[in-house]
């Protein structure tokens, strides 16, 4: 058990100046979109996964236990199902490698949106609020929550690529 008493934050209204939404959205788009466009599956893992996705989408192997050349899939099925489903739905409109990446780009965008909203809701709670100043000037609840959510989103973007090649 932690015996140290909590040390609440002292945050001024000036410290939580609003980050322009357009700038934040452009930054998120610059993070998500390059992983979708202008590249082919050239790494070994990309080629292998794409091969299974394409075989599933074309009906050359069963969805429940996909194989290529008699070799069973050694990784999780869900990502391959998502890619195969996207290929089946989108391949008449776009090429198969791009179609296979679309659900993963959407999932990454969803993670970014949900992280921002979760941090925003958490920072709006009474327990998360900074201490009020004796003569005013403390951060407004919504402005403080927005600044914390922006920081959480930027921290996620900064560290996600370090954990795994996400795009």
Model-identified regions with their sequence ranges:
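Membrane-integral, polyisoprenol-dependent glycosyltransferases
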Residues: 2-167
């Amino acid at each position: 058990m932690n015996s140290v008493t909590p040390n609440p934050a002292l945050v001024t209204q000036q410290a939580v100046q609003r980050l322009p939404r357009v700038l934040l959205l452009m930054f998120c788009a610059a993070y998500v979109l390059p992983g979708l466009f202008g590249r082919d599956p050239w790494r070994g893992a990309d080629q292998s996964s794409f091969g299974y996705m394409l075989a599933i989408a074309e009906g050359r192997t069963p969805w429940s236990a996909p194989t290529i050349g008699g070799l069973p899939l050694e990784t999780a099925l869900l990502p391959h199902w998502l890619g195969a489903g996207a290929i089946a739905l989108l391949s008449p409109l776009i090429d198969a490698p791009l179609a296979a990446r679309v659900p993963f780009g959407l999932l990454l965008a969803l993670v970014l949106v949900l992280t921002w909203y979760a941090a925003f809701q958490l920072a709006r709670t009474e327990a998360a609020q900074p201490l009020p100043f004796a003569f005013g000037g403390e951060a407004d609840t919504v402005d403080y929550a927005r600044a914390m959510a922006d920081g959480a989103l930027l921290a996620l973007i900064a560290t996600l690529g370090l954990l795994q090649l996400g795009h």
